[in-house]
Amino acid sequence: MNIVIEGCDGTGKSTIAKHLCEMLGLQYWHESQPRNLQEYVQMLDYGGFVFDRFCFGQFVYNTPDQRKLTVEELKYLTEKVFPATNTVFLYVDAHTDTIIKRLIERGEGNEKIIPEMTKYIKNIRGTYRSVLRQAGVPYIEINGEGGANYVKQNN
């Protein structure tokens, strides 16, 4: 079994991933990306991971020439490899204001650039939904508004 968690920075992915690892005895894998399709498949075949970002983030945050997979390879992963490796996909989202607050709290922005951050985050959230739709990913959407306390109280 594998669990892939994707979503905009500041939605609570890492918090959820760490709690799932503790609860299910799975290994935590954070953002380090395989170099090609074969490496993605090998990691999923090995199994037992909670991936805090996997292949979808690179389509959202990178330009086409920086991506390590094509759209066709992404579809292959979601249509063939995910089901064969018992991989569950979670998409974590939160309101833009919540994301901005969390990013500022951890030093990844400041109050002077909130209008720019708002535009950027809305774009990222929209791009995630577009990429998931294009790839035909069946996913469970999680509301990341509750934060760490919500995850702890409900596990």
Regions found by a protein language model. Give the residues of each.
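Short, solvent-exposed loop/turn segments at secondary-structure junctions
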Residues: 10-11, 55-57, 95-97, 146-148
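Glycine-rich, phosphate-binding/catalytic loops in enzymes
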Residues: 22, 66-69, 106-109
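A glycine- and Lys/Arg-enriched "phosphate-lid" helix/loop adjacent to the NTP-binding pocket
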Residues: 79-130
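Walker A (P-loop) ATP-phosphate-binding motif of ABC ATPase nucleotide-binding domains
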Residues: 2
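NTP-dependent small-molecule kinase module
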Residues: 19, 108-109, 117-155
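Hydrophobic anchor at the beta1->P-loop junction of P-loop NTPases
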Residues: 5
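Substrate-gripping "pore-loop 1 plus following alpha2 helix"
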Residues: 64-79
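Conserved substrate/cofactor phosphate-moiety recognition/catalytic segment
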Residues: 8-11, 15-66
